[in-house]
């Protein structure tokens, strides 16, 4: 890490990591996930570089930003293999995978009252195995690894009112927007392009309101997730619940 000037710093890092398969990946669940006791640990060499900083122009304004890029060379990448017709899956190893990507984030704060934030991520994860074990060319070479979002972002906005109804109280209003680009459920090399299973693009908006008093000892929160009731899916194209409401009360005891 090196500080170039006060609002601008640079950070470069390298790491070698090993990820062992978890129990579900090795043994399955007995119904929808098949066991694969031959699953190998995942090894990766990771290179990261980022620019970041905080700027205080005055009058209670604060800006924070970070831009980063990364490259990961992964051996025995663990991923899910989906059997669409059977509705089952199994964790398998992809012998060689390269992950290239970039991320950006910006945050703004005004006197602890107004907070704005946005971020976007791009992750290009591709199969790098040119030939199969029998020497034949691999059809999935340079394909994106399926069932994995590769472009997504979010926007957040919060505003806090102080001393509403009670002294030493705070009322915070918040709204968030999340976006995910569509991606393939299975390898893009298999089947006709127009008929491939895809997880469609998703646009989800959430809203919440939190009221706290007695210096945060008592907290009451109300939240509405997906308040526009848009269709949403998880990584396996299983539909998530639509609009939902939640209420929560917290009491801190010293």
Question: What is the predicted function of each stretch?
Answer:
Residues 1, 8, 12-13, 40-48, ...:
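Conserved C-terminal beta-signal and adjacent last beta-strands/turns
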Residues 31-39, 87-93, 101-103, 134-145, ...:
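Extracellular loop and loop/strand-boundary signature of outer-membrane beta-barrel proteins
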Residues 64-73, 92-186:
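Gram-negative outer-membrane beta-barrel transporters
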Residues 23-30, 77-85, 123, 127-137, ...:
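Outer-membrane beta-barrel translocator domains and adjoining extracellular loop/strand segments
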Residues 1-6, 20, 117, 132:
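Signature of Gram-negative outer-membrane beta-barrel scaffolds
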Residues 20-29, 41, 76, 80, ...:
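Generic structural "secondary-structure junction" signal
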Residues 9-13, 41-100:
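Membrane-embedded beta-barrel scaffold of Gram-negative outer-membrane proteins
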């Amino acid at each position: 890490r090196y500080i170039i000037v006060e609002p601008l710093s640079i950070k470069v890092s390298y790491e070698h990591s090993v990820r062992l398969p978890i129990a579900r990946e090795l043994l399955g669940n007995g119904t929808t996930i098949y066991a694969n006791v031959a699953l190998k640990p995942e090894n990766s060499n990771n290179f990261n570089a980022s620019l970041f900083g905080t700027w205080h122009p005055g009058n209670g304004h604060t800006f924070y930003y970070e831009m980063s890029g990364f490259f990961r060379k992964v051996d025995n990448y663990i991923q899910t293999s989906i059997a669409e017709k059977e509705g089952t899956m199994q964790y398998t190893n992809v012998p060689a995978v390269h992950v290239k990507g970039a991320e950006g984030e910006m945050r703004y704060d005004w006197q602890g009252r107004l907070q704005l934030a946005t971020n976007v991520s791009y992750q290009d994860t591709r199969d790098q195995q040119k030939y199969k074990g029998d020497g034949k060319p691999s059809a999935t070479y340079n394909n994106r690894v399926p069932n994995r979002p590769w472009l997504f972002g979010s926007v957040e906005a919060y505003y806090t009112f102080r001393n509403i109804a009670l002294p030493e109280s705070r009322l915070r209003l918040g709204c968030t927007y999340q976006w995910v680009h569509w991606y393939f459920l299975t390898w893009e090399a298999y089947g006709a392009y127009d008929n491939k299973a895809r997880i469609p693009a998703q646009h989800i908006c959430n809203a919440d309101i939190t009221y706290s008093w007695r210096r945060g000892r008592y907290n009451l929160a109300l939240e509405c997730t997906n308040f526009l009731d848009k269709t949403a899916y998880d990584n396996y194209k299983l539909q998530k619940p639509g609009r939902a409401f939640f209420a929560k009360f917290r009491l801190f005891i010293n």
